[in-house]
């Protein structure tokens, strides 16, 4: 949270105080909107962050918009759905399932497993960011999504099927505190105004991602500590300073 809030503020101040003529792309998150049972959030919908992380990201968004309006900084905000792909940190949902299943460990699913996330392959997200950097309008917000909505349990089952692992590896565990039910973004703005659309199918991207983790143990193994791979990491004791960084 410290990096998100003070880091964003420091960057904005540095640009303002040095009269730098540069464009800032502030990469936010769909979590600033909170969950939604029906429909999808648009860029001008009210923010209702439900976690400390989401609240800090929403605050950073407000800083960016304020500096654009007050000081004329060339700032654009993007809000993207859940990313997946190579080099994602092992604590994240998809990498954790792949790694634990590959090790023959139980695959933890929070609560009922019915929570829904909209997934986007990392390369689609990167191409959207590049397009916004080049052609986006200053002071605007752009939602980025691929409309690949799946329940968490379905994602786990798909991964196990691709890996030829048994479904009995799935283990339902205590739900995460403040676990939002469903995220969904309306990305019609970037599609219409900047002619962006996702290129990669979900199934192909998931297969590529699994293959990457299986072939690149050298990268993730030093990161995949017992704490990182823990089924319910929020119950563990963490260094308070690191959590605030």
Residue ranges and their predicted role:
Residues 1-83, 152, 208, 213-218, ...:
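N-terminal Rossmann-like NAD(P)+-binding domain of SDR-like oxidoreductases, especially those catalyzing
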Residues 5-13, 91, 123-126, 130:
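Conserved active-site region of classical short-chain dehydrogenase/reductase
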Residues 9, 36, 56, 87, ...:
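Gly/Ser/Thr-rich beta-alpha loop segments that engage phosphate groups in nucleotides
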Residues 11, 64, 97, 190-191:
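Structural element of the ATP-grasp superfamily
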Residues 29-32, 82-88, 114, 134, ...:
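Active-site proximal helix/loop that lines the substrate pocket
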Residues 49-56, 86, 90-94, 118-122:
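The catalytic Tyr-centered alpha-helix of NAD(P)H-dependent dehydrogenases
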Residues 78, 90-91, 136:
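Active-site loop immediately N-terminal to the catalytic Tyr-X3-Lys motif
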Residues 95, 101-245:
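C-terminal substrate-binding subdomain of Rossmann-fold SDR/epimerase-dehydratase oxidoreductases
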């Amino acid at each position: 949270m410290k990096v998100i809030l003070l880091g964003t503020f420091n960057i904005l101040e540095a640009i303002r105080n040095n009269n730098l003529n540069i464009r800032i792309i502030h990469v936010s998150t769909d979590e600033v909107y909170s969950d939604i049972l029906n429909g999808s959030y648009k860029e001008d919908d009210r923010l209702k962050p439900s976690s400390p992380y989401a609240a800090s990201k929403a605050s950073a968004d407000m800083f960016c918009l304020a500096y654009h309006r007050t000081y004329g900084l060339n700032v654009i905000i993007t809000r993207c759905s859940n990313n997946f792909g190579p080099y994602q940190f092992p604590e994240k949902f998809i990498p954790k399932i792949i790694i634990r299943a590959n090790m023959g460990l139980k695959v933890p699913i929070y609560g009922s497993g019915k929570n829904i996330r909209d997934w986007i392959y990392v390369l689609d997200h990167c191409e959207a960011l590049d397009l916004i950097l080049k052609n986006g309008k200053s002071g605007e917000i752009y939602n980025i999504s691929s409309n690949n909505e799946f329940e968490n349990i379905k994602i786990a089952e798909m991964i196990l099927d691709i890996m030829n692992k048994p479904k009995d590896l799935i283990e339902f565990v205590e739900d995460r505190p403040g676990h939002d039910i469903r995220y969904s973004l309306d990305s019609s703005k970037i599609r219409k105004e900047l002619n962006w659309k996702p290129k990669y199918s979900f199934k192909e991207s998931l297969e590529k991602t699994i293959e990457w983790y299986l072939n690149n143990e050298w990268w993730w193994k030093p990161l995949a500590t017992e704490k990182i791979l823990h089924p319910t990491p929020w119950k563990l004791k963490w260094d308070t300073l690191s959590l605030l960084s």
